[in-house]
Protein backbone atom coordinates (compact mmCIF):
# COMPACT_ATOMS: atom_id res chain seq x y z
CA UNK A 1 0.00 0.00 0.00
CA UNK A 2 2.87 2.39 0.69
CA UNK A 3 4.23 1.93 -2.84
CA UNK A 4 1.11 3.36 -4.52
CA UNK A 5 0.92 0.50 -7.04
CA UNK A 6 -2.19 0.22 -9.15
CA UNK A 7 -4.61 -2.63 -8.57
CA UNK A 8 -3.57 -4.07 -11.92
CA UNK A 9 0.10 -4.15 -10.87
CA UNK A 10 -0.75 -5.77 -7.55
CA UNK A 11 -2.84 -8.44 -9.27
CA UNK A 12 -0.06 -9.17 -11.78
CA UNK A 13 2.47 -9.62 -8.97
CA UNK A 14 0.07 -11.82 -7.01
CA UNK A 15 -0.44 -13.98 -10.11
CA UNK A 16 3.34 -14.42 -10.44
CA UNK A 17 3.67 -15.40 -6.77
CA UNK A 18 0.77 -17.87 -7.06
CA UNK A 19 2.36 -19.42 -10.18
CA UNK A 20 5.64 -19.82 -8.30
CA UNK A 21 3.91 -21.62 -5.43
CA UNK A 22 2.03 -23.86 -7.90
CA UNK A 23 5.48 -24.77 -9.22
CA UNK A 24 6.77 -25.41 -5.66
CA UNK A 25 3.90 -27.61 -4.42
CA UNK A 26 4.99 -30.93 -5.98
CA UNK A 27 8.68 -30.22 -5.43
CA UNK A 28 8.59 -29.13 -1.76
CA UNK A 29 5.78 -30.91 0.11
CA UNK A 30 6.87 -29.13 3.32
CA UNK A 31 5.64 -25.84 1.79
CA UNK A 32 2.24 -27.25 0.83
CA UNK A 33 0.24 -25.54 3.58
CA UNK A 34 1.86 -22.15 2.95
CA UNK A 35 1.40 -22.58 -0.81
CA UNK A 36 -2.31 -23.31 -0.37
CA UNK A 37 -2.73 -20.21 1.82
CA UNK A 38 -1.01 -18.01 -0.76
CA UNK A 39 -2.98 -19.51 -3.64
CA UNK A 40 -6.23 -18.78 -1.80
CA UNK A 41 -5.51 -15.03 -1.62
CA UNK A 42 -8.18 -13.20 -3.64
CA UNK A 43 -7.30 -10.76 -6.39
CA UNK A 44 -8.33 -7.14 -5.97
CA UNK A 45 -11.40 -6.12 -7.93
CA UNK A 46 -11.05 -3.24 -10.36
CA UNK A 47 -13.63 -1.12 -12.08
CA UNK A 48 -13.83 -1.91 -15.76
CA UNK A 49 -12.70 1.15 -17.68
CA UNK A 50 -15.18 2.24 -20.32
CA UNK A 51 -13.70 2.40 -23.79
CA UNK A 52 -14.06 5.69 -25.61
CA UNK A 53 -16.17 5.91 -28.72
CA UNK A 54 -16.65 8.53 -31.39
CA UNK A 55 -19.85 10.46 -32.04
CA UNK A 56 -21.39 10.46 -35.51
CA UNK A 57 -19.91 13.90 -36.26
CA UNK A 58 -16.46 12.74 -35.13
CA UNK A 59 -16.72 9.61 -37.27
CA UNK A 60 -17.82 11.68 -40.28
CA UNK A 61 -14.84 14.00 -39.82
CA UNK A 62 -12.45 11.05 -39.47
CA UNK A 63 -13.80 9.27 -42.56
CA UNK A 64 -13.45 12.49 -44.56
CA UNK A 65 -9.88 13.18 -43.35
CA UNK A 66 -7.87 11.10 -45.88
CA UNK A 67 -6.98 12.90 -49.11
CA UNK A 68 -9.15 11.27 -51.78
CA UNK A 69 -6.83 12.44 -54.57
CA UNK A 70 -3.81 10.39 -53.50
CA UNK A 71 -3.56 6.57 -53.63
CA UNK A 72 -2.56 6.42 -49.94
CA UNK A 73 -5.57 8.58 -49.08
CA UNK A 74 -7.90 6.29 -51.03
CA UNK A 75 -6.42 3.28 -49.24
CA UNK A 76 -6.79 4.96 -45.84
CA UNK A 77 -10.36 6.03 -46.57
CA UNK A 78 -11.25 2.44 -47.52
CA UNK A 79 -9.53 1.14 -44.36
CA UNK A 80 -11.33 3.57 -42.07
CA UNK A 81 -14.70 2.94 -43.73
CA UNK A 82 -14.25 -0.83 -43.50
CA UNK A 83 -12.99 -0.75 -39.90
CA UNK A 84 -15.93 1.40 -38.81
CA UNK A 85 -18.73 -0.12 -40.91
CA UNK A 86 -17.87 -3.73 -40.08
CA UNK A 87 -16.59 -3.09 -36.53
CA UNK A 88 -13.39 -4.97 -37.32
CA UNK A 89 -10.48 -5.49 -34.99
CA UNK A 90 -7.19 -4.12 -36.34
CA UNK A 91 -5.90 -7.66 -36.94
CA UNK A 92 -9.08 -8.58 -38.85
CA UNK A 93 -8.88 -5.44 -40.97
CA UNK A 94 -5.25 -5.94 -41.92
CA UNK A 95 -5.84 -9.63 -42.72
CA UNK A 96 -8.57 -8.87 -45.30
CA UNK A 97 -7.64 -10.37 -48.65
CA UNK A 98 -8.95 -9.75 -52.13
CA UNK A 99 -10.82 -13.08 -52.08
CA UNK A 100 -12.70 -12.22 -48.85
CA UNK A 101 -15.47 -10.61 -50.89
CA UNK A 102 -17.87 -13.43 -51.86
CA UNK A 103 -18.48 -13.69 -55.62
CA UNK A 104 -16.40 -10.56 -56.24
CA UNK A 105 -19.18 -8.36 -54.88
CA UNK A 106 -18.45 -5.74 -52.25
CA UNK A 107 -21.90 -6.04 -50.66
CA UNK A 108 -20.51 -8.50 -48.07
CA UNK A 109 -17.16 -9.37 -46.60
CA UNK A 110 -15.99 -12.66 -45.10
CA UNK A 111 -13.94 -12.06 -41.96
CA UNK A 112 -11.85 -14.57 -40.06
CA UNK A 113 -12.02 -13.35 -36.48
CA UNK A 114 -10.81 -14.31 -33.03
CA UNK A 115 -10.66 -18.04 -32.44
CA UNK A 116 -10.67 -18.60 -36.23
CA UNK A 117 -14.39 -17.85 -36.30
CA UNK A 118 -15.60 -16.92 -39.75
CA UNK A 119 -18.43 -14.45 -40.23
CA UNK A 120 -19.96 -12.72 -43.23
CA UNK A 121 -20.85 -9.06 -42.75
CA UNK A 122 -22.87 -6.72 -44.96
CA UNK A 123 -21.20 -3.50 -46.08
CA UNK A 124 -22.74 -0.06 -46.52
CA UNK A 125 -22.81 1.53 -49.97
CA UNK A 126 -20.32 4.22 -48.84
CA UNK A 127 -17.93 1.50 -47.70
CA UNK A 128 -18.31 -0.37 -50.98
CA UNK A 129 -17.60 2.84 -52.92
CA UNK A 130 -14.48 3.54 -50.81
CA UNK A 131 -13.17 0.01 -51.45
CA UNK A 132 -13.84 0.29 -55.20
CA UNK A 133 -12.01 3.64 -55.31
CA UNK A 134 -8.99 2.08 -53.59
CA UNK A 135 -9.01 -0.95 -55.90
CA UNK A 136 -8.98 1.35 -58.93
CA UNK A 137 -5.51 2.62 -57.91
CA UNK A 138 -4.19 -0.41 -55.97
CA UNK A 139 -1.26 -2.12 -57.72
CA UNK A 140 -2.28 -5.46 -59.25
CA UNK A 141 1.09 -7.20 -59.27
CA UNK A 142 1.34 -7.52 -55.47
CA UNK A 143 0.11 -9.87 -52.74
CA UNK A 144 -3.48 -10.87 -52.03
CA UNK A 145 -3.89 -8.57 -49.01
CA UNK A 146 -6.32 -5.71 -49.59
CA UNK A 147 -4.33 -3.06 -47.73
CA UNK A 148 -0.69 -2.55 -48.67
CA UNK A 149 2.02 -0.13 -47.67
CA UNK A 150 3.86 1.97 -50.23
CA UNK A 151 6.34 -0.87 -50.83
CA UNK A 152 3.53 -3.24 -51.84
CA UNK A 153 3.79 -5.30 -48.65
CA UNK A 154 0.87 -5.93 -46.27
CA UNK A 155 0.21 -2.95 -44.02
CA UNK A 156 1.22 -3.60 -40.40
CA UNK A 157 -0.69 -2.87 -37.23
CA UNK A 158 1.75 -0.06 -36.39
CA UNK A 159 1.38 1.33 -39.89
CA UNK A 160 -2.39 1.41 -39.51
CA UNK A 161 -2.17 3.04 -36.06
CA UNK A 162 0.23 5.67 -37.46
CA UNK A 163 -2.10 6.50 -40.37
CA UNK A 164 -5.06 6.64 -37.97
CA UNK A 165 -3.22 9.17 -35.76
CA UNK A 166 -2.50 11.33 -38.80
CA UNK A 167 -6.15 11.33 -39.86
CA UNK A 168 -7.34 12.06 -36.32
CA UNK A 169 -5.12 15.17 -36.36
CA UNK A 170 -6.77 16.29 -39.62
CA UNK A 171 -10.26 15.49 -38.27
CA UNK A 172 -9.57 17.66 -35.20
CA UNK A 173 -9.74 20.75 -37.40
CA UNK A 174 -13.30 19.95 -38.48
CA UNK A 175 -14.45 18.48 -35.16
CA UNK A 176 -12.38 19.74 -32.20
CA UNK A 177 -14.13 17.37 -29.74
CA UNK A 178 -12.17 14.44 -31.20
CA UNK A 179 -8.99 15.94 -29.68
CA UNK A 180 -10.24 15.00 -26.19
CA UNK A 181 -10.30 11.31 -27.09
CA UNK A 182 -7.49 8.81 -27.42
CA UNK A 183 -8.53 7.37 -30.79
CA UNK A 184 -7.18 3.88 -31.43
CA UNK A 185 -8.28 1.13 -33.82
CA UNK A 186 -10.25 -0.38 -30.93
CA UNK A 187 -12.08 2.92 -30.31
CA UNK A 188 -13.12 2.87 -33.96
CA UNK A 189 -14.47 -0.67 -33.44
CA UNK A 190 -16.46 0.45 -30.39
CA UNK A 191 -17.86 3.44 -32.26
CA UNK A 192 -19.58 1.03 -34.63
CA UNK A 193 -21.17 -0.97 -31.82
Protein language model features and the residues they cover:
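Conserved catalytic core of the tyrosine transesterase superfamily
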Residues: 1-192
Amino acid sequence: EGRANTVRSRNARLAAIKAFFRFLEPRRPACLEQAMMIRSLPVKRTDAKLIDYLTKDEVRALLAAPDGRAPAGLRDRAMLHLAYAAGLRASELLAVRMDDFPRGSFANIRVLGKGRRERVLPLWKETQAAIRAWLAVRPNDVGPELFLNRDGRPLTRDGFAYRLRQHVAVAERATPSIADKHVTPHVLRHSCA
